[in-house]
Amino acid sequence: MAELHIIGQIVGASGFPQNSLFCKWGIHTGGAWRLLSGLKEGQTQVDLPQTGYMAYWSHPIDLHYTTKGLQGHHHVRCVTWRPLGSWQEQIAQTFVGGGPQLRSSNIIYSGADRYRLHTVAMGTVELELGIIMRHFDRY
């Protein structure tokens, strides 16, 4: 079987209206991929930068997959969004903070329900990933 190692980090994020940021992340693959080691989802710590507009996390990513077929790709810069609540929730968010949250993150990955989400664009998250492939020449 072909093997894929992903070693890197979630560097940080910029372009968000607030400075106190964390990142909840996940790697989702097709049925041909199997995770051998590492965590396929997680959450960074919160960073509140004292200077500048970049929140730094340096959150490590270390994954080892095996696959029977080739599919998928990776991104280095990820644009982000957040749920957009009702106008009452938006006003409350302005004065109190917080904001609407998804009841279940599974709605993001199913195309049938995703079209009902109302979202607003936010900043970008930067990743540095090193990819090591083994036995891909056999497939």
Language-model features and meaning:
Residues 1-139:
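Eukaryotic Ser/Thr- and acidic-rich low-complexity regulatory segments
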